[in-house]
């Protein structure tokens, strides 16, 4: 059973996920490696909420949770499970359980294996508050998961079960969820990491209406990363990400052509340089564009996969003042 990426009917449990795609008769999708496909964010799911994690968990994956703690909240839990069966209960590799109803609110973390809870770990000084909004980011590494709350590192928990066994996310208890996001870590070692701050997903935000203009008042400096996340519309025609200088010239533009399924850099003078990569921008698919600025040019990553670099004069980089996004997309996040 597959569901759209919006809210769910009460009690709905999701056991698989797929990307709906509109195609012409006889048309076939180009083969795309699983590593290039990102699971779309889910907005306003009804709790309890259970969903498959597309591709399972692996080192370098992030799960972002945005929401509000109700004023009368007692507790809630976020479980990273090994399956989604109801009976027997699946193993839980990482159980994250904030508790508010005690005199000293705290978080309990634990692992459920073979129907038995193991030794629990407790963290005091809970950074979550009743009646307040939050952004929790789970960053999965090789040996442990790190958790940040509202941009501050909060805890780390060493795995007791193999991370590769985890394929399901469960959210239960007293929590109002605004969005759940599934991301890959920034692949650029020299670029800024999103953990622990995170950049929230926004649904139908006026600031992200397309065409979208994002100011770069200080220009761009080496190590700076631009993030663009969104969803391709049902009948896409074009998609461009351009960088403009003070004279409104665009020294460099990233353009996705839906007619011939190509991705290319377009210079100020209209010269095209094709990018060798699977074409990811299919209808109703989630995408992430990362641009890392470095000395002499910029690097590109799509959906967490590095795709090389293009050269650009350093002086031209410093004179850039605007990021402009246009085309057949719905934007969820733009950050620089």
From Swiss-Prot:
Domain Galectin as annotated: residue spans: 49-183, 212-336
What GO MF terms are annotated? lactose binding
> Can you tell me where the transmembrane regions are?
none
| Any one of the GO CC terms | cytoplasm
Subcellular location, record wording? Nucleus
Q: Please list the tissues where expression of this protein has been recorded.
A: Not widely expressed. Predominantly expressed in adipose tissue.
Question: A GO term (biological process) for this protein?
Answer: intrinsic apoptotic signaling pathway
Q: SUPFAM superfamilies in the record, alphabetically?
A: Concanavalin A-like lectins/glucanases
Which Pfam family is one of this chain's hits? Gal-bind_lectin
| Principal localisation | nucleus
Q: Which InterPro entries match?
A: ConA-like_dom_sf (IPR013320), Galectin-like (IPR044156), Galectin_CRD (IPR001079)
Keywords on record: Apoptosis, Lectin, Nucleus, Repeat
Domain comment in the entry? Contains two homologous but distinct carbohydrate-binding domains.
Q: What does this protein do?
A: Binds lactose. May participate in the apoptosis of adipocytes.
PANTHER family referenced in this protein's UniProt entry, alphabetically: GALECTIN, GALECTIN-12
Protein's recorded name: Galectin-12
Its source organism is: Homo sapiens (Human)
- Lineage in the entry? Eukaryota, Metazoa, Chordata, Craniata, Vertebrata
């Amino acid at each position: 059973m597959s569901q759209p990426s919006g809210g769910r009917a009460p009690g709905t449990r999701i056991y698989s996920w797929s990307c709906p795609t509109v195609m012409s008769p006889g048309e076939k999708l180009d083969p795309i490696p699983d590593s290039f496909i990102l699971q779309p964010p889910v907005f306003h799911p009804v709790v309890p909420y259970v969903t498959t994690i597309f591709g399972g968990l692996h080192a370098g994956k992030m799960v972002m949770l945005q929401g509000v703690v109700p004023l009368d909240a007692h507790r809630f839990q976020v479980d990273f499970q090994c399956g989604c069966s109801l009976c027997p209960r699946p193993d839980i590799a990482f159980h994250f359980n904030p508790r508010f109803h005690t005199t000293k609110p705290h978080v309990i973390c634990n692992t459920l294996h073979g129907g038995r809870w193991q030794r629990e770990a407790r963290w005091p000084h809970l950074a979550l508050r009743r009646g307040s909004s939050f952004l929790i980011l789970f960053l999965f590494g090789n040996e442990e998961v790190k958790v940040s709350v509202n941009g501050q590192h909060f805890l780390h928990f060493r795995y007791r079960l193999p991370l590769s066994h985890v394929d399901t996310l469960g959210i239960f208890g007293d929590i109002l969820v605004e969005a759940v996001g599934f991301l890959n870590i920034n692949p650029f070692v020299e670029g800024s990491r999103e953990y622990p701050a995170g950049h929230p997903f926004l649904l139908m935000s006026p600031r992200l209406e397309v065409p979208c203009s994002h100011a770069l008042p200080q220009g761009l400096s080496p190590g700076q990363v631009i993030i663009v996340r969104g969803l391709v519309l049902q009948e896409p025609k074009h998609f461009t990400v351009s960088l403009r200088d003070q004279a409104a010239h665009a020294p460099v533009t990233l353009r996705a052509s839906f007619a011939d399924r190509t991705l290319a850099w377009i210079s100020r003078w209209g010269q095209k340089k094709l990018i060798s990569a699977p074409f990811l921008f299919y209808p109703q698919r989630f995408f992430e564009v990362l641009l890392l600025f470095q000395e002499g040019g910029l690097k590109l990553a799509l959906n967490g996969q590095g795709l090389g670099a293009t050269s650009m004069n350093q002086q031209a980089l410093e004179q850039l003042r605007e990021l402009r996004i246009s085309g057949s997309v719905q934007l969820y996040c733009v950050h620089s």
